[in-house]
Regions:
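Catalytic cores of enzyme domains
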Residues: 91, 100-310
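Iron-sulfur (Fe-S) cluster-binding modules
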Residues: 1-106, 114-119, 288, 292-310
Length: 310
């Protein structure tokens, strides 16, 4: 079964005779969760989960299709600068739709997947909490349902935000959590929201790695872009920890992160990861075993910094 033909895809809607942002020559190929499950895991295991996840799966698919169908529904005379009131209203709406933290940055072309593209270079990045009580039980039906709940909430949120920006006269493109055209952890890291850990997920001060990410792209020129990242100590800490490496049931997380000639990283073997993800309720062991999930961010940072000085 060729899942790429069944899944909504931006390339089916992109108008190549109009301006868009293409991936860089060194961009990596991107896969959606369903594609990885079908390519390396067990679609039948996921099919058995439909009674538990059906509502969210259908909702995610609907919102994903909606994001692509609305690509070119934009204002006739779009504004390039956002007013203070509109920015406040934008962030208030995002939080009312479930977003916990918000960051802004410029998309690097190398972050765009090689088999994709986007319309606008500036990005509003959103995260949402996967509830710790449910993720702590992973792998379980409860944790699996929470994973897909957050996918659905974010997919719906970015479409609502896109519609809001359009209604105020700004260009916008929704970047759903399930699917998407860009490496979201890299984008969120660049936006100063956290830092990627050894497991390849974004670690945030608020919730550790127990989050999902989504994006809204725009050409608004005066967004409050992040200029720095105060979380760059995390990779050094991860080198002393390796808990996720040791706890991964598939042995999918590389103890020595693969670093390519262009400086990009590969943290996990997707083939190995997809097997327990598809067969064992979305797995998520790497999230619940991460020390940033279990402990307070500031306490971990202060203890690590003190140890480095001693």
């Amino acid at each position: 079964m060729n899942i790429s033909r069944l899944m909504p895809n931006i390339n089916k809607h992109l108008k190549r005779d109009r301006e868009y942002i293409a991936p860089a020559s060194n961009s990596h190929e991107g896969y959606s969760v369903p594609e990885l499950v079908l390519k390396y895991g067990s679609i039948w295991s996921k099919a058995r989960a439909i009674p538990n996840l059906g509502h969210y799966m259908i909702g995610c698919l609907y919102q994903l299709k909606k994001s692509y169908r609305s690509l070119y529904r934009q204002p006739l005379e779009p504004k390039q600068e956002i007013s203070e009131k509109d920015l406040l209203d934008l962030e208030s709406l995002a939080r009312s739709l479930g977003a916990c933290n918000i960051g802004y940055t410029v998309v690097e072309p190398s972050y765009i997947f090689s088999n994709s593209a986007i319309l606008y270079r500036n990005a509003m990045v959103l995260d949402i909490l996967m509830e710790h009580g449910k993720i702590r039980s992973a792998p379980s039906k409860s944790a699996e349902k929470e994973i897909f709940r957050t996918y659905y909430v974010l997919n719906r949120a970015v479409n609502k935000i896109k519609e809001f920006l359009n209604s105020r006269g700004y260009n916008a493109q929704a970047g759903p959590a399930l699917g998407g055209e860009v490496n979201y952890p890299l984008l969120a890291q660049k936006a100063g929201m956290g830092h990627i850990g050894k497991h390849g997920m974004l670690i945030t001060p608020s919730f550790g790695p127990s989050i999902r990410l989504a994006v809204v792209y725009t050409d608004i020129s005066n967004l409050p872009m992040s200029e720095s990242n105060e979380h760059s100590w995390i990779p050094d800490f991860c080198e002393t920890c390796n808990r996720c490496v040791n706890k991964c049931p598939a042995g999918a997380i590389y103890k020595d992160t693969v670093i390519y000639e262009d400086g990009s990283h590969r943290y996990i073997g997707y083939k190995k990861c997809s097997v327990p993800f598809s067969k064992d309720r979305g797995c998520t062991v790497c999230v619940k075993e991460c020390v940033f999930f279990k402990g307070e961010y500031n306490r971990i940072r202060d203890g690590f910094m003190k140890k480095k000085k001693d």
